[in-house]
Amino acid sequence: MAPAALWVALVVELQLWATGHTVPAKVVLTPYKPEPGNQCQISQEYYDKKAQMCCAKCPPGQYAKHFCNKTSDTVCADCAAGMFTQVWNHLHTCLSCSSSCSDDQVETHNCTKKQNRVCACNADSYCALKLHSGNCRQCMKLSKCGPGFGVARSRTSNGNVICSACAPGTFSDTTSSTDVCRPHRICSILAIPGNASTDAVCASESPTPSAVPRTIYVSQPEPTRSQPMDQEPGPSQTPHIPVSLGSTPIIEPSITGGISLPIGLIVGLTTLGLLMLGLANCFILVQRKKKPSCLQRETMVPHLPDDKSQDAIGLEQQHLLTTAPSSSSSSLESSASAGDRRAPPGGHPQARVTAEAQGSQEACAGSRSSDSSHGSHGTHVNVTCIVNVCSSSDHSSQCSSQASTTVGDPDANPSGSPKDEQVPFSQEECPSQSQWETTETLQNHDKPFPLGVPDVGMKPNQPGWYDQIAVKVP
């Protein structure tokens, strides 16, 4: 068999030689000069410009230790540790392997003479900056999709994730860079519908299910209807229907009395306000009743000299006889005699003023005494009184005790009348009179006294004008 094969090979070579194309049996490493316009025959050769010859390249894991020349071919050598050559080359040195992988990277290929070290990002990171060699220079954390969002598509090699909102009927309740939106739970009885971030809740599910049957009472109000008047109300008009429940729990609504609390508070405050208002009105009415119905004020009578006071007494008697002929002469005489007795030794007219002031104490009770005296027999005289004010409680009692009745029966005993009593003028003056009022009285000594309504026609220079101030007979 072997000689036959050799003969076949020889025949083929002869035919090729005859045609002018010769093919060497093996590749010759010796350099050769390429034909003009032609390149080196194979890719494992390179053209050396210095030698102008085609020379062989070094295989992966080796480098060109010596370059070729016209007589010798390229001499190759293996790469040292930590260095490599990955392709056919004619480098004068090997390439260094990449540095060790960082903490966020993982080494996928070790450094060898024929291959560089390869680092890839961790599962929770992606390559943000990739080199031409395929290694990743910088890794970053993957984006995380929050609740309501899910990963739109799976992450590509060294790529970041893309988040998208969950479509209707799906949800995502986690924060993750890998979870996608999941469909809602399908319930026969839906208790709580789901949304983009929560799943649906079925009515048959409960956090603490109870398998023990129990009985509850459901209150149902009766329909409105007319009832007889003699029906006595029972303790409760609402029937209770017992309902037996199985293992399925239900939510029992609790009725609280939260509405009754504000109503009771409002009613209580309203009642308290009305009570306070009533007490205030009662206090005002009591204060109004305590006020006196008649305010007394001491009349300031101008001081007259002695001669004028004597003339005034005489003119008063004459005027009373002239204007009131029907009056009793005995009452006028008693009035005149009382005025003479009460006059001081020096003839000072202050005694007359005191007598007139004493008679004026009955201003408040004058109307009652006059009305009561109409039923009695005798002659009555209506007297216009000048009020004397006593502010103090002690002096008011004193002043009232000194008052004399000017309306009465003229036939009464004159000895029992208070006119016979000698009362000093100092006791008739009220201590409540202010200093200003005293000064005002002294200043009005020579001024005319203001006249009343019946005295408008009488002038101060007419006789008897002063007497009408004390007593006026209609």
Curated annotation (Swiss-Prot):
Localization, UniProt: Membrane
Region span, Disordered: 220-241, 321-378, 397-464
Principal place of residence: membrane
Gene Ontology molecular function: tumor necrosis factor binding; tumor necrosis factor receptor activity; ubiquitin protein ligase binding
Glycan attachment sites: 30, 69, 110, 195, 208, 224
Assigned GO CC terms: axon; membrane; membrane raft; neuronal cell body; perinuclear region of cytoplasm; varicosity
Comp. bias intervals (Low complexity): 324-338, 366-378
UniProt record, GO biological process: aortic valve development; cell surface receptor signaling pathway; cellular response to growth factor stimulus; cellular response to lipopolysaccharide; cellular response to tumor necrosis factor; extrinsic apoptotic signaling pathway; glial cell-neuron signaling; immune response
Protein name: Tumor necrosis factor receptor superfamily member 1B
Organism expressing this protein natively: Rattus norvegicus (Rat)
Protein's gene: Tnfrsf1b
